[in-house]
Amino acid sequence: MSEASKSIMDLLSEVVKITDMTMDNEAVNKLKPQIKINPFYRAVQDVLVEQKSKIDLSTKMMKDLEAQENDERLDTMLKAEGVAGPDDSLLRIQEAAGTDQYEYRQQLLKVRRELENETKAFDKHCKKWCEYVEDVLQQQGEFRPITQQSTEKFMNKMSGKFNKVCFVLKQTACEEVIQLKKRYLDARRKRRNFSKTSTEILNEYFLANINHPYPSEEVKQALAMQCNISVAQVSNWFGNKRIRYKKTMAKNEDERRENRKPEDRPPPGAPGAPYSLVPNAFAGMMNPYQMMLPGHQFPIGVAPFNFSMYNPEMMAQYQQSLQNPNQTR
């Protein structure tokens, strides 16, 4: 091997060592001057520049228009709900006091604070990482051809990757806003849930006044102030509560009647029996002779169906016909 070839191989071996070395600044600082004083250092640089020129480096920054539109759509939604943009969350909460949007605005403020904290921490990490990469490229530029154009292109790629993470953070915040809307502001729901505290206050008053659960207008106004809701909502709540309470009591009564012992139940078909086909008031009308049986009571001075009050002979014949039905034929 010639002396020139040996020098080139030595130079390349030293370059390879840099890639395998650990981040020992002292060793790197000692190795850098040795590479630069090598007589073939400039020749290696020229070869690397020539090879780099053969690589097609597109200077056009291809923008993903669809991703950009989605990002703008997320920003618009977050600004409309006060999660992004000027911080007027406290003002919106004060304006929503006493309405059904009060708790919704409080939850939006939590989403805004979480998004701000995560974005701020991520931006700090991103800035630190970009500075580190730029410093590495600058140091490597002493030994391999790294142009300013290449550095800018690489930094733009890194910014694009970090922007994707920001997009995910915004998307997560938007999903939380959508869930809050479904929970608090969905107009398709038949009713809106009050807060746990408001429900406890209203239930406490209802149970304390169970015999007369009809609060006056003054009481409704006081309850509305305590629960941060409107007087109309208080009236609707008590109306619905009374209906549900009556239905519950009726259901419990039916279950108690069904769970009675067999000996306590009336026979099937008897007046008051659960499966009787005749109403109680007209059960006795099916057999007009039933009212002539001994012991049957009827209004004084009134004979049912214009019969006499009691005829023993007719009753004896009737009972005998029931006992011997074949003899009457």
Swiss-Prot record:
SUPFAM superfamilies named in the record: Homeodomain-like (SSF46689)
UniProt protein name: Homeobox protein ceh-40
DNA-binding region (UniProt annotation): 187-249
Chief location category: nucleus
Any one GO CC term of the record: nucleus
Disordered, as annotated region: 248-275
Cystines in this chain: none
InterPro entries to which the protein is assigned, alphabetical: HD (IPR001356), Homeobox_CS (IPR017970), Homeodomain-like_sf (IPR009057), KN_HD (IPR008422), PBX_PBC_dom (IPR005542), TALE_homeobox (IPR050224)
Tissue: Expressed in head dopaminergic neurons.
Family per record: Belongs to the TALE/PBX homeobox family.
Region (PBC-B): 93-186
Organism: Caenorhabditis elegans
Disruption phenotype annotation: Worms show no phenotype but, when also lacking ceh-20, incompletely penetrant embryonic lethality is observed.
Segments forming domain PBC: 3-186
SMART domains assigned: HOX (SM00389)
Pfam family, one: Homeobox_KN
Function per UniProt: Plays a role in regulating gene expression in dopaminergic neurons, acting redundantly with homeobox protein ceh-20 in head neurons. May activate dopamine pathway genes in concert with ETS domain-containing protein ast-1, and homeobox proteins ceh-43 and ceh-20.
Biased composition (Basic and acidic residues): 250-266
Subcellular location: Nucleus
Keywords: Developmental protein, DNA-binding, Homeobox, Nucleus
Coiled coil: none
Region of interest (PBC-A), residue spans: 10-90
GO molecular function annotation: cis-regulatory region sequence-specific DNA binding; DNA-binding transcription factor activity, RNA polymerase II-specific
